[in-house]
A protein has these predicted regions:
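A conserved, well-ordered hydrophobic junction motif at loop->secondary-structure transitions
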Residues: 36-51
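Small beta-barrel nucleic-acid-binding modules, principally OB-folds
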Residues: 66-82
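HotDog/MaoC-like acyl-thioester-processing domains
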Residues: 2-10, 16, 22-28, 84-85, ...
Length: 144
């Protein structure tokens, strides 16, 4: 979409924000603190990525029963809105695929804005792939 207008981009963001919720429990919930910010005063994207990785790992263990995974890919990470100090950020995770040794997890991140009385906005989405390993860090089959 080479000639995409700003209006088109805003409409796509609005459509993403109005997508139905994923069918999962909250994997983790964190209040963002001043230590999490970048030089622009918003939460550093790397902090969000780190929590996405943790949330996806929680879901992988919860859905497969296997207790050791390593992250092998983070796909299509989309930062939709900034996150601010004081936001209560929820990381929802949903298993999208379980293979022989790997599991794919979709993570949706929502921020309840500080002082917003419960109103949340979708801020980030990602797809994360994990591979099951044993205590020797060797790839193993899931649940078998």
């Amino acid at each position: 979409m080479e000639n995409q207008t700003e209006e088109d981009k805003n409409e796509q963001t609005a459509n993403r924000n109005s997508q139905p919720e994923i069918k999962s429990e909250v994997a983790i919930r964190i209040t963002m603190m001043p230590r999490d910010t970048n030089s622009h005063g918003t939460v550093f994207g790397g902090i969000i990525l780190s929590y996405i990785d943790v949330a996806g790992g929680v879901e992988a263990v919860r859905r497969t029963g296997h207790d050791r995974f390593v992250t092998v890919a983070m796909k299509e990470i989309i930062f939709l809105q900034p996150v601010f100090i004081g936001d209560l950020v929820s990381f929802y995770a949903e298993t999208t695929k379980v293979g022989n040794t790997s599991v794919s997890i979709r993570v949706v991140v929502e921020a309840q804005r500080f002082g917003s009385h419960g109103q949340s906005v979708r801020v980030t989405e990602a797809e994360v792939v994990y591979v099951a390993i044993n205590q020797y860090r060797e790839k193993v089959k899931i649940g078998k």
